[in-house]
Amino acid sequence: MSALPPAIFLMGPTAAGKTDLAIELTKVLPCELISVDSALVYRDMDIGTAKPSKALLAQYPHKLIDIIDPAESYSAADFRTDALAAMAEITARGNIPLLVGGTMLYYKALQEGLADMPAADAQVRAELEEEAARLGWQALHDQLAAIDPVSAARIHPNDPQRLSRALEVWRVSGQTMTEHRLKQSAQSADAGASGQSQLPYTVANLAIAPANRQVLHERIAQRFTIMLEQGFVDEVVALRSRGDLHPGLPSIRAVGYRQVWDHLDGKLTSAEMQERGIIATRQLAKRQFTWLRSWSDLHWLDSLDSDNLSRALKYLGTVSILS
């Protein structure tokens, strides 16, 4: 058995059933839950993020949920710092950190460390938003392709959050995101050669999703419709009424929120908002699958199977997590 303490990553696309399985695991294993979700960190954003209910969170606490205000930014570096601290606390209690969620960049940051990229710059971000409004996101994507074709190839023109971040990194630091990542890869290789690990845990990697992709698409559509019935629009109305939030913030750019915000701005009808929200969520799931396909040592579970708990426990036993 490894001398490093154990941890479990439970990954998967949105609407795949990660939370349900995580809770089942905590009932039979000495696990404590850590959320790995870039939207669940925000307070007062409950319906559109499909946040577990307050009653469920009271019974099965998740760390890193409801930790910042929607006006604030929360980076992958922030997550790594907070997650490592939470994992250390859980391990010190003799329990296993069980990290559950679908923000794959957070998992990657935790597992491999982060390149030394510049912090967010409000002025540069505002300039990019103005350019996008004037020229369109495709024009900004063309800019990125000219300076950083590698990043441009993996970032879609309709992904404004990642596109603006890539351009922001270049404008602030004078180096592209690809250049920063190449530096980080070299540092990681050096660490590996010296026997150092970026993450001081023995990690078991689980992923859950329906084997039939159409089932996931149907779940996404159904869940978005239920969110609207639960008062998603009213939730965004309340956020707008604060007066300090705007579509340039990461919180409001979250899938679903930006479509409802545009609807309230009169840019989309109710039907268009619902359709685009569902499409954006499906696109998110597609990106999550892309990340997951590149993840090594990943054990897949089918959401539609009735015995995923026993399958997960069997796998965890084979990788010595339960030894």
From Swiss-Prot:
SUPFAM superfamilies: P-loop containing nucleoside triphosphate hydrolases. Its cofactor is Mg(2+). ATP binds at G12, P13, T14, A15, A16, G17, K18, T19. This is tRNA dimethylallyltransferase. GO terms for biological process: tRNA modification. Keywords: ATP-binding, Magnesium, Nucleotide-binding, Transferase, tRNA processing. Residues 37-40, 161-165 are annotated as: Interaction with substrate tRNA. Belongs to the IPP transferase family.
